[in-house]
Amino acid sequence: MAYRKLGRTSSQRKAMLRDLTTDLLINGRITTTEARAKEVRKTTDKMITLGKRGDLNARRQAATFVRNEVADVIEDGDDVKVQSALQKLFDDVAPRFAERNGGYTRILKTVQRRGDAAQLVILELVD
């Protein structure tokens, strides 16, 4: 299995990929290094594919990877609805890509980081 180590142990790497994937699903775009973005793109595409399947097993598989973070707070008078990242994946993000077979993200190169000249990129969901 080919993957990037990203200078971390396996548990640190998995935690970082979970965090970045969840942030991308919540916000729609993140700024990170090119190597990280290429790895996050793989995990994000897998999560969106699970969201498109939409069955209970797919929801459980996605729940093991996506962080349990608040994605949105909707206030309607006295009602306050809190939407988690998992709910946003299945209710908002996955239906946007119902007609698309993969390629849910795009990587746009930006400037190099000042401290170590690492190539920074913007990773965003395709509209």
From Swiss-Prot:
PROSITE patterns attached here?
Answer: RIBOSOMAL_L17
Q: Does the keyword Ribonucleoprotein apply?
A: yes
The molecular function terms in GO held by this entry are:
structural constituent of ribosome
Give the InterPro entries listed for this entry: Ribosomal_bL17 (IPR000456), Ribosomal_bL17_CS (IPR047859), Ribosomal_bL17_sf (IPR036373)
Keywords carried by this UniProt record: Ribonucleoprotein, Ribosomal protein
Record keyword Ribosomal protein present: yes
Record's Pfam families?
Ribosomal_L17
**Matches recorded under Gene3D superfamilies:** Ribosomal protein L17 (3.90.1030.10)
Its GO biological process annotations read: translation
Any one Gene Ontology cellular component term annotated for this protein: cytosolic large ribosomal subunit
Quaternary structure and interacting proteins, as annotated: Part of the 50S ribosomal subunit. Contacts protein L32.
Family designation: Belongs to the bacterial ribosomal protein bL17 family.
**Protein name per its UniProtKB record:** Large ribosomal subunit protein bL17
Q: Which organism is it from?
A: Leuconostoc mesenteroides subsp. mesenteroides (strain ATCC 8293 / DSM 20343 / BCRC 11652 / CCM 1803 / JCM 6124 / NCDO 523 / NBRC 100496 / NCIMB 8023 / NCTC 12954 / NRRL B-1118 / 37Y)
